[in-house]
Amino acid sequence: ASDVYKRQARAIHLGFALTLAFLIFPAVRGKKISILDIIISITGALSCLYIYFFYDDLVNRGGILLVKEIFGFKVPVELIIGATGILILLEATRRAIGLPLVIIAVCFLLFSYFGKYAPDIISHGGLSVKRLVGFQWFDQEAIFGIPIGVSVDFIFLFVLFGALLETAGGGKYFLDLAFAMVGKMRGGPAKAAILGSGMTGMISGSSIANTVTTGTFTIPIMKKTGFSQEKAGAIEVSSSVNG
């Protein structure tokens, strides 16, 4: 039962993320969020919540997508929902991260469909649109696979409590302690970042959450004291991973 709840939690998690993506990132940088963005965000959230509400039916049908007869026409309901969700996710990725990752994702989707035309060493029979959408959107091994699971089980929780810790002054305490110990030394901000990340890592236990939590403080401080943006980021990442 817990496994079922985890899978449903992933759907809620992605739906929440899609909603935020379209409400925070406009279609074009510098533009305001439009009514269309709000509609798309709601549509993306509903595509995810469909999995939450009808998860048992999806499992019982064993990957067969639902087709309903509406006004005498057979409508592939779940094919439409899944395809819509995938397209909205790609657009959210473009807005939040950039076009390169979207291009990579689209290339793999095309490879899944046109696999029989690929070179022999990587060729396969190819997936139909139904199987492709069904696997990508309604299966636990694709979009709702391990990365979303890690985000739900670890990253989100640690980032949330890291934000609470920061609001309560805990993050500042760790950094103040680190700066008090090594701040006057040569390269003090970098050493303080390493110590601060190590101490925060004892609480979070997650390198990614550790980077997000402590990097908010340490990277700007290192940049102010003369470290380049790249070096400051590299120091924070390495110290958070080892911490």
Language model features: what each stretch is:
Residues 161, 165-175:
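Juxtamembrane interface elements at the cytosolic ends of transmembrane helices
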